[in-house]
From Swiss-Prot:
Organism, as annotated: Mus musculus
Binding site for a protein: R533, Y654, R706
Subcellular locations according to the entry: Cytoplasmic vesicle, Secretory vesicle membrane
Quaternary structure, from the entry: Monomer. Interacts with RASSF9.
Bias-annotated ranges (Acidic residues): 955-968
Protein name (record): Peptidyl-glycine alpha-amidating monooxygenase
Length: 979
């Protein structure tokens, strides 16, 4: 009895203990109160996905992130959805399991961030993924198996520094599987733990942005290489990606000339993350290298890096882990810093991996998209240089990197051979790589949802060949293009008459190839002065979230960063600036010949005497200390010095939105400006004030408000806003401006996905703001034109921070004059129009001054004014009446003669039919005056009288009159050499 009681007591105590332990157990669901706010009502067809959180034990749980039952309406649709991390404390993702099939999903990307681009249950990814910094956590495509992280390795989320939200992006390539209109709930399941992981995972992306595959070419190599300049990382998995033409992708670590394989795989196999065969560590000073081998066989035209399956891509994703205290979650490489090194690449990298046909079918790209018109890219990816967008938005671009639209870039398709039409790359336009914005389709995505909301984060998701990552600023707001200049509407370039700028093809300076060209200026002798970055590159690893430079260990640039170039021979006349700068940016020259430069890494402004070796004359700002007070800058961009007063104006900058004025001695005077807000920024608001231009005689300072795509002008004395210049053709960015009396020159940035405006230079009438010319280079192409300077004779120089190139442009013959000569060449004499036309040959020494050019424009305006002179209708009427009278007389004579001498055996016709029948040419159903007059006696087109054919009315004239319809055709231009 006592034993039974004892057993019952033990059982009761056990139950109580179990209950208390259950009460003490803190289920993940118990802290998910906020999660209820965003719980989704899934479609009935998605049953089983309605429980997104499942506890595993006291510290671990799974999180299902799935589409809430969607049905894409068109191929190549990108849908995004977000889910908040259901815990406040730090957690770690230690496993992923894809919940998708290639039958419906082309690829998926999972990002971590703190602010999704939308709060809806799902949205078109054209609106972006995140509005702040985002980290890619996972990528899946082509029925890939789950990615396994090594023990002790996890992606850090939550807490004070980790991401609070997950954003899932799903690319639906072929929608034929949705013909039954079923709902899709594809996604990924995460295994999370609260247990701190000693090793933090990250992703290193290597990608090409400028590969061109000629048609029919058997083997084409695309090489990528970058110096590794971070704490050691340990590679444990990799993934390759190309489209149809890729044969093999190989990745290596190069240390002291020795190549160590990271991974090698056929991109035609399922595109999973494959584990490395042997552990590979990468340390400071190593080089990471990758090669993609393509074939152009079977193609009839060149294939470029792009976002459709008929384009190509060359991507290698390296998954790594680092010690938690040094961890960096994402790094990129889009350059080839050591092209000669690939001469020693292991032979295996050049050998395609055989793939069975059934395996190709398993993972093949969707065929229905192959013949689609190639979408314009972009882009650009910035290649680490300055696109003031969050590094995270860069990942949106990654979405394009994973599939048929996975390019980077850019909106405007990168095509190095487009010399006159495009002038811009992919990423970039991936380039360009970057955030998914409208991919060029117009149906379901157009409208307010796309036009107004779609730009919010996409502004940050361009790669601009990935050098434009230049900063990790907050993304610019959505903005609609406005027109505040008189008479502006949908923009059409007025390439009229007497002002046209073209590249000076004889100038050899385009092949100088210094480092990233950040600034250009002209000294008092009209010598070109270049400010460049040598072997330093501004990329996503350059700054932390507080804009503190992270690569001080590299030391200053060990070569001369300021080059004085002969404007004709492009010879280096003088150089300076060694061991002074880390990341050069703006350059200007005052009336005394002093150089004013900015360094975004140092957060400082320097005044330099060109030939002095005693150091700067003046330094503003604190070295390596970003700030926003009177003594600090935050990545200052440019300087302008007023000639009359010596006042110094500094545009500050990437992380401040202001203009700061100093005295000639460097004393703070005043500042103005604030950060832009909303889609319609107000006067005096800036989003990266990037370039300055003084208009001395009007006491105005004009600012290239880069990310707002406009130019703002202010009074230098009162700081009063004067006006805004903004054109649709600017696109979303205005990078740099330069003023000469009467004219304002500007250069824009690469287009975003879905945008049409190419990257190009502009010439504007300063008084009216109207665009009077646009121009692009012939040799090479603009990728990220970063600065512009013009001389008073109309010579223009543009420096590109991505292609490391400087172009020279000069005034050329006016278009009107060329047409005038063409008319004369055709045998028609036209009186010379001397006052309205200016013929300016590129090599003429005495080029017209800017004041003369301004007069030309005024005269052109008078000539074009429709309100002046005799009305056009009256002139036309006076000209037409004599022609009608002569025609009537001729027809009457013809009719009379045919009655007297016509063939009486033919079938009678009405008089009207007889006349019109005679006036018809071969195969014609209307009046042919050429054949009519050709039948008259004494008329000859070739110097001989035509033999009469009136005796045979039933025979049609075998002469089709083509000779009488000859037009003068100018010979086709010789194709420009590709570079």
């Amino acid at each position: 009895m006592a034993g039974r009681a004892r057993s019952r007591l033990l059982l009761l105590l056990g139950l109580l203990a179990l209950q208390s332990s259950c009460l003490a157990f803190r289920s993940p669901l118990s802290v998910f109160k906020r999660f209820k706010e965003t719980t989704r009502s899934f479609s009935n067809e998605c049953l089983g996905t309605t429980r997104p959180i499942t506890p595993i034990d006291s510290s671990d749980f799974t999180l299902d992130i799935r589409m809430p039952g969607v049905t894409p309406k068109e191929s190549d649709t990108y849908f995004c959805m977000s889910m908040r991390l259901p815990v406040d404390e730090e957690a770690f993702v230690i496993d992923f399991k894809p919940r998708a099939s290639m039958d419906t999903v082309h690829h998926m990307l999972l990002f971590g961030c703190n602010m999704p681009s939308s709060t809806g249950s799902y949205w078109f990814c054209d609106e972006g993924t995140c509005t702040d910094k985002a980290n890619i956590l996972y990528a899946w495509a082509r029925n890939a198996p789950p990615t396994r992280l090594p023990k002790g390795v996890g992606f850090r989320v939550g807490g004070e520094t980790g991401s609070k939200y997950f954003v899932l992006q799903v690319h639906y390539g072929d929608i034929s599987a949705f013909r039954d209109n079923h709902k899709d709930c594809s996604g990924v399941s995460l295994h999370l733990t609260r247990v701190p992981q000693p090793l933090i995972a990250g992703m290193y992306l290597m990608m090409s942005v400028n590969t061109v595959i000629p048609p029919g070419e058997k083997v084409v190599n695309s090489d990528i290489s970058c110096h590794y300049k971070m704490y050691p990382m340990h590679v444990f998995a990799y993934r390759v990606h190309t489209h149809h033409l890729g044969k093999v992708v190989s990745g290596y670590r190069v240390r002291n000339g020795q190549w160590t394989l990271i991974g090698r795989q056929s991109p035609q196999l399922p595109q999973a993350f494959y584990p490395v065969e042997h552990p590979v560590d990468v340390a400071f000073g190593d080089i990471l290298a990758a090669r993609c081998v393509f074939t152009g066989e079977g193609r009839t035209e060149a294939t470029h890096i792009g976002g459709t399956s008929s384009d190509e891509m060359c991507n290698l994703y390296i998954m790594y882990y680092m010690e938690a205290k040094h961890a960096v979650s994402f790094m990129t490489c889009t350059q080839n810093v050591a092209p000669d090194m690939f001469r020693t690449i292991p032979e295996e990298a050049n050998i395609p991996i055989p793939v069975k046909s059934d395996m190709v079918m398993i993972h093949g790209h969707h065929k229905e998209t192959e013949n689609k018109e190639k979408s314009a890219l972009i882009q650009q990816p910035k290649q680490g240089e300055e696109e003031a967008f969050e590094q995270g938005d860069f990942y949106s671009l990654l979405s394009k990197l994973l599939g048929e639209r996975e390019d980077v870039v850019h909106v405007h398709k990168y095509n190095p051979t487009e010399k006159t039409e495009s002038g811009s790359d992919l990423v970039a336009e991936i380039a360009n790589v970057v955030q998914k914005k409208d991919l060029g389709r117009s149906d379901a995505r157009e409208g307010a949802e796309h036009e107004e909301g779609g730009n919010a984060i996409l502004v940050r998701d361009r790669i601009h060949k990935f050098h434009r990552l230049e900063s990790t600023l907050r993304p610019a707001e959505s903005r609609a293009l406005s027109f505040q200049q008189p008479g502006e509407g949908p923009w059409e370039p007025e390439l009229a008459g007497d002002f046209h700028v073209e590249e000076a093809l004889e100038w050899p300076g385009v092949y100088l190839l210094p480092g990233q060209v950040s600034g250009v200026a002209l000294d008092s002798k009209n010598n070109l002065v270049i400010f460049h970055r040598g072997d330093h590159v501004w990329d996503g690893n350059s700054f932390d979230s507080k804009f503190v430079y992270q690569q001080r260990g590299l030391g200053p640039i060990e070569e001369d960063t300021i080059l004085v170039i002969d404007p004709n021979k492009a010879e280096i006349l003088q150089s300076s600036g060694k061991n002074l700068f880390y990341l050069p940016h703006g350059l200007s020259i005052d009336t005394d010949g002093n150089y004013w430069v900015t360094d975004v890494a140092l957060h400082q402004v320097f005044k330099l005497e060109p030939r002095s070796k005693e150091g700067p004359l003046l330094v503003l700002g604190r070295s390596m200390q970003p700030g926003s007070d009177q003594n600090h800058f935050c990545q200052p961009t440019d300087v302008a010095v007023e000639p009359s007063t010596g006042a110094v104006f500094v545009s500050d900058g990437y992380c401040n939105s202001r203009i700061v004025q100093f005295s000639p001695s460097g004393k703070f005077i005043t500042q103005w400006g604030e950060e832009s807000s909303g889609s319609s920024p107000k006067p005096g608001q800036f989003s990266v004030p990037h370039s300055l231009a003084l208009v001395p005689h009007l006491n105005q300072l004009c600012v290239a408000d880069r990310e707002n795509g406009r130019i703002q002008c202010f009074k230098t004395d009162t700081k009063e806003f004067v006006r805004e210049i903004k054109h649709a053709s600017f696109g979303r960015n205005v990078f740099a401006i330069s003023y000469i009396p009467g004219f304002l020159f500007a250069v824009n940035g690469k287009p975003y996905f879905g945008d049409q405006e190419p990257v190009q230079g502009f010439v504007m009438n300063f008084s009216s703001g109207e665009i009077i010319d646009v121009f692009k280079p012939v040799r090479k192409h603009f990728d990220m034109p970063h600065d512009i300077v013009a001389s008073e004779d109309g010579t223009v120089y543009i420096g590109d921070a991505h292609t490391n190139t400087v172009w020279k442009f000069t005034l050329t013959e006016s278009r009107l004059e060329v047409e005038h000569r063409s008319v004369k060449k055709a045998g028609i004499e036209v009186p010379e129009i001397k006052e309205a036309e200016a013929v300016v040959e590129p090599k003429v020494k005495n080029k017209p001054t800017s004041s003369e050019l301004q007069k030309m424009q005024e005269k052109k305006k008078l000539i074009k004014d429709p309100g002046s002179g005799v009305p056009v209708v009256l002139i036309t009427t006076l000209l037409v009446i004599p022609v009608v009278v002569l025609l009537a007389i001729a027809m009457f004579i013809r009719w009379k003669k045919s009655r007297a001498f016509g063939d009486h055996d033919r079938k009678l016709e009405s008089s009207s039919g007889r006349v019109l029948g005679r006036l018809r040419g071969k195969g014609s159903s209307g009046l042919n005056l050429g054949n009519f007059f050709a039948s008259r006696k004494g008329y000859s087109r070739k110097g001989f009288d035509r033999v009469s054919t009136e005796g045979s009315d039933q025979e049609k004239d075998e002469d089709d009159g083509s000779e009488s319809e000859e037009e003068y055709s100018a010979p086709l231009p010789t194709p420009a050499p590709s570079s």
